[in-house]
Amino acid sequence: MLFSSLATALALASSATAIPTFALEVRQATTLNAAMVARGRGYIGTSLTIRSDNSEQNLIKGAEFGSITPENAMKWDATEPNRGSFSWSGADQIANFATQNGKQMRCHTLVWYSQLPSWVNQINNNATLMSVMTNHIQQVMGRYKGKCTHWDVVNEALNEDGTYRDNVFLRVIGEQYLPISFRIAAAADPAAKLYYNDYNLEYGDAKHQGALRIVKLVQSWGVKIDGVGLQGHLVTEKTGTQSTPTPSVDVLTKVLQDYADLGVDSAYTEVDIRMNTPSTADKLKVQAAAYARVAQSCMNVARCVGITLWGVSDKYSWVPQTFSGEGAALLWDNNYAKKPAYQSFLDVLNGKNATMT
């Protein structure tokens, strides 16, 4: 009888210890955004262009993404092609899509040298450009006030060596256009998180130092800047357009921590990790490790609030048209099949081990 009772007790104890393990497995998120939110972060997002082919929109409507960024529809050439004459149709479409599908909207971008109408580039008077810049920021942010959780206020203001990129705003207004832009934006929508956004910050070199100086400059004016966006247009291997593959977890983490040390958040804002095409099984494994490094670096720094992918499927990626002979940069292939990088990315977000080299 004693043996029977002991056996029963041991069996019950064994069952009791098995329950938490089972529950832990059940709690593992099965979608990217759910995994990110479960880690106490803000979102996994994607860029969006509304197309007649609904494949991407239908996938975005699901649970994989919690945030969307207008790929082109909120840029200056799309919203104010002629001075004082605003066009909202494309941006409204995306804002409505976000609202209807319960997505955050990370809005992009207000002051940028590219996709800028020629009439802006032709301005050579300080007062005129100040008026134009102020009105543009106020009108665009005002229309989407309360709908944009984050704004890329200034985009790509730096050269690779960390100096200021030549553009009409720098030539006519001077470096103060940076804090002035943030001051106007903060007044236009006080609730929105305001970011400086750029590419090639991830390597921790001179350009990253330039971004740190921009944060300090804006802060020195007593103006709000909430974060730095690292675009994350990276490569798996040396390509014709980029010689340095995606950095190590340690390098990426240090870069993000540098921003946190200045009291601002960070986010990966336009991630795609391209390779020399065509892709192979081995190249896809290398890509999976690179995506894992990006995700892990964000998990390592509490002030990294989110990761946005620059597209869903390779089918519509901007990469092949921009970088000849390169592509296969996203988590879904041309046929919307998940690539190995999807699983490694999800595993890291779920706190699981993933190969990172």
Kindly give the residue locations of the regions a language model identified.
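Acidic-and-aromatic substrate-binding clefts and catalytic sites of carbohydrate-active enzymes
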Residues: 46-58, 76-89, 158-163, 201-210, ...
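Structural recognition of alpha->loop->beta junctions
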Residues: 61-67, 126-129, 139-149, 215-227, ...
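Glycoside hydrolase catalytic-domain groove-lining segments
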Residues: 87-89, 93-104, 172-194, 204-279, ...
